[in-house]
């Protein structure tokens, strides 16, 4: 399984992904799901991938080949993030059709984020069908893969004016919550922070399984959650609570 998230706030974008690929209890491997395209002088892109490994690898290989060979259409030539998303979606569909593997089981989805000079930074999610959606002011983050466990903390914390450092910490807590509830998601954890208008992808870190900071984060978050839970107001069966009428309770 996979978990990737990209958080787009006013100050920039945070990208976070796990590196565990699971094809059964006895087939667990490590593959990076974060890919950078940073050779353009006026643009920077990061792609996070989830889904069929063969499809994602073929898609990324084709994207890199187009850049390397100065193709007419590539991530170095598109004029907007939306055009970049359309292009990646088209390549993904082409890779599936080339090998006759369209349909469930061979699908892949992508998070594409970055900035082209003269426009604002953006994050988009590209579906297996090739269409895409973008993050919004109401929901400044997008997830792919095993998203449900890490979503609550993002909903509570992330706003457009959230500082990048806070967004990065929130992404790691989101990842920790996912790893705790789903063993098919796991380290190494990759994180990259892009500062708006910097056109630089230098703020990258890879957290290994035995990383001291990850262990401390997990321990602290667990402790603070338990402490907060025990400080909740006690459940009081107040006199004004609606009583269950005898014979009309619906309880059998």
Each predicted region: which residue ranges?
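Short, surface-exposed beta-edge/turn micro-motifs
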Residues: 1-4, 11-12, 43-45, 107-110, ...
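Solvent-exposed alpha-helices and their adjacent loops that cap or buttress functional pockets
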Residues: 1, 7-8, 27-28, 37-41, ...
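Conserved short S/T/G-enriched processing/targeting/catalytic segments and their helical context
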Residues: 4-100, 144-155, 159-162, 216-241, ...
């Amino acid at each position: 399984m996979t978990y990737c998230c990209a958080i787009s706030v006013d100050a920039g974008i945070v990208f976070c992904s796990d590196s565990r690929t699971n094809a059964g209890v006895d087939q667990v491997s490590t593959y990076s799901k974060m890919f950078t395209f940073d050779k353009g002088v006026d643009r920077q892109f990061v792609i996070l991938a989830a889904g069929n490994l063969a499809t994602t690898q073929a898609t990324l290989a084709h994207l890199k080949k187009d850049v390397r060979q100065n193709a007419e259409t590539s991530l170095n030539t598109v004029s907007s993030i939306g055009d970049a998303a359309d292009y990646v979606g088209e390549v993904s569909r082409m890779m599936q059709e080339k090998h006759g593997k369209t349909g469930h089981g061979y699908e892949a989805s992508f998070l594409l984020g970055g900035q082209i000079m003269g426009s604002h930074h953006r994050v988009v999610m590209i579906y297996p069908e090739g269409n895409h959606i973008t993050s919004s002011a109401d929901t400044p983050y997008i997830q792919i893969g095993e998203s449900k466990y890490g979503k609550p903390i993002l909903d509570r914390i992330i706003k457009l004016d959230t500082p990048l450092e806070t967004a990065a910490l929130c992404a790691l807590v989101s990842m920790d919550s996912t790893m705790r509830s789903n063993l098919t998601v796991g380290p190494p954890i990759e994180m990259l922070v892009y500062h708006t208008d910097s056109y630089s992808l230098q703020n990258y870190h890879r957290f290994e399984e035995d990383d001291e900071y990850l262990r401390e984060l997990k321990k602290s978050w667990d402790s603070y959650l338990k402490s907060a839970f025990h400080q909740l107001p006690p459940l009081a069966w107040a006199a004004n609570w609606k009583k269950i009428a005898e014979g009309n309770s619906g309880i059998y």
